[in-house]
Amino acid sequence: MAKKNDPLFTSFFIELYPEFYQKLKTVQPNLTLVEQKVCFYLKLKFTTKEIAECTFVSVKAIQNRKNRLRKRLYIETDVDIYIWIDQL
């Protein structure tokens, strides 16, 4: 479902990980749907390349989205974003 960029992916993910979703919304309640989806893919341990393939955008676009997420979620540059997301 995630690898096919299925529109139901978001609702299915929220059903499976409701606590994660609530914590994410607590940290930054104004995330866009695209930003939320990138967080969901990161939670599932998708690589930047895999996220790009699933969302039909370039690797560079995903790198930029991850950098913007760092700013929006107040993640320091020396912190691994995968670990931060996983510990949320």
Regions found by a protein language model. Give the residues of each.
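Cytosolic nucleotide-binding catalytic cores of signal-transduction proteins
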Residues: 3, 7-88
